[in-house]
């Protein structure tokens, strides 16, 4: 965090055609970022949160690792592949198909074999037993830690 606080800053006009978050993500791509931590991207205005989530998926498609946070909760866009997260035991999490995905999870209180999911609450409120592994076989998903 100290490194982020000492980073160069740009002042953006209040009235513009994109959110501050989108401007930040464009700049990150321009600078060749491999990882992005988007602070203040969750909570607050729902319209901004939804746009930031979509933009996070776009960056992930370009190979950038993205984490969104409001300081209390964290979210990670997941594309097809195997994703490992070093969670502490009892860490609560949800996996959301975004909008649909075939995915499985291991290392959770309720493991899930690869399952096609769409518009469901089945993958809400799980609990890590320790590190978890999420395999997205198709579609997109969001890992939400709370």
Give short role names for the model-derived ranges.
Residues 15-18, 61-64, 92-94, 119-121:
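Glycine-rich loops and low-complexity Gly/Arg-rich segments
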Residues 39-41, 69, 96:
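Short beta-strand segments
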Residues 1-62:
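Acidic/Gly/His-enriched mid-domain segments of enzyme catalytic cores or analogous surface patches
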Residues 28, 47-89:
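Conserved phosphate- and dinucleotide-binding cores of soluble alpha/beta proteins
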Residues 2-4, 31-33, 59-61, 69, ...:
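Generic detector of short, locally flexible boundary/turn motifs and exposed helical patches
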Residues 71-73, 78-146:
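Long, charged alpha-helical interface segments
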Residues 11-13, 68, 97:
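Structural signal for conserved beta-strand scaffold positions within catalytic alpha/beta enzyme cores
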């Amino acid at each position: 965090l100290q490194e982020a606080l000492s980073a160069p800053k740009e002042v953006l006009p209040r009235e513009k055609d994109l959110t501050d978050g989108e401007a930040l993500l464009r700049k990150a791509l321009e600078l060749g970022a491999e990882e992005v931590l988007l602070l203040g991207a969750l909570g607050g205005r729902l319209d901004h949160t939804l746009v930031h989530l979509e933009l996070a998926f776009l960056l992930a498609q370009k190979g950038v690792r993205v984490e969104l946070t409001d300081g209390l909760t964290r979210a990670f866009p997941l594309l097809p592949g195997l994703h490992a997260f070093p969670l502490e035991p009892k860490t609560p999490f949800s996996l959301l198909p975004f909008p649909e995905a075939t995915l499985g999870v291991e290392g959770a209180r309720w493991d899930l074999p690869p399952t096609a999911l769409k518009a469901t609450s089945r993958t809400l409120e799980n609990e890590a037993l320790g590190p978890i592994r999420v395999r997205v076989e198709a579609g997109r998903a969001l890992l939400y830690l709370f």
